[in-house]
């Protein structure tokens, strides 16, 4: 009986549900005091995300506090890099730092195929524990970074405002970039399969920086590798719902739907009704409340959620923010978001 399955999983599969499921990107993180206290005790991000006890505890913090409909693995999109031979660290206030940025074909040729069970057994352990702990009260989500976004980090060596280094590679040495992207696509597909086999019920691919590409370059350097990941995962796990998120995606929404994903996660810069008009009926949506709204009042949060859900009615919809919750967000407003999301049908009425 599918009613015994988690609400988010049923909604992501396109079943008729009593309300849109709700979770938040970065729902485990700095806006929560309990997380900040743990961070003070364990200042290394890599330790927090790679020690299975800490990763599990952090993943569960928002579940204990707010009971979201999805519990996402606490990790990072860069976590698989060392398994391919790329070292990195995440420095507080500076973000990711790549020890030896990839700029040559020789460096790409030297990369190892990713074997997640060997290089990241902690991920499998945490996902299994999450499934056991939340049962059918929430769906367990796994996630990865998409090939283009991983390439942007490893070529630039760090976060970037203008992506000049990787853009230079796009236009001067595209053959190096294509080989790197292909390696990442194969590895990321393996990583997602491992996550699903370990307990992830729904998966999301973040192509955070693909919004920096023109549509033509998106078609060349992002979409084919997104599609390769999706195809490889769907070949072995056809029933696992697949979400794709891009920050700044308003110009490529239709292209996102062509990658084979089940759900397009929208940022807040596009109107929900207008986005749905641009997407085929079978494609679901996730989002797309402005995370900045969570600095407002509970009444404003409720009104905006109502508007978002009203516009998405009749379509497969997962309520979320249009980006990760921002550091400094009042924790009580995170709670208000979940409360308003769970009670939305009391205000709007009828079945989704």
Curated annotation (Swiss-Prot):
CDD domains on file: URO-D
Top-level taxon in the UniProt lineage: Bacteria
Associated pathway: Porphyrin-containing compound metabolism; protoporphyrin-IX biosynthesis; coproporphyrinogen-III from 5-aminolevulinate: step 4/4
Catalyzed chemical reaction(s): uroporphyrinogen III + 4 H(+) = coproporphyrinogen III + 4 CO2
Protein name, per record: Uroporphyrinogen decarboxylase
Alphabetized Pfam families for the sequence: URO-D
Site location (Transition state stabilizer): 76
Classification via SUPFAM superfamilies: UROD/MetE-like
Keyword Nucleotide-binding in annotation: no
Subunit-level organization: Homodimer.
InterPro entries in alphabetical order: UROD/MetE-like_sf, Uroporphyrinogen_deCO2ase_HemE, Uroporphyrinogen_deCOase
A Gene Ontology term for the protein's cellular component: cytoplasm
EC number, UniProt record: 4.1.1.37
Record key words, sorted: Cytoplasm, Decarboxylase, Lyase, Porphyrin biosynthesis
Physiological role: Catalyzes the decarboxylation of four acetate groups of uroporphyrinogen-III to yield coproporphyrinogen-III.
Annotated family: Belongs to the uroporphyrinogen decarboxylase family.
Organism: Synechococcus sp. (strain CC9605)
Subcellular location: Cytoplasm
Example GO BP: protoporphyrinogen IX biosynthetic process
Membrane spanning stretches: none
NCBIfam families: hemE
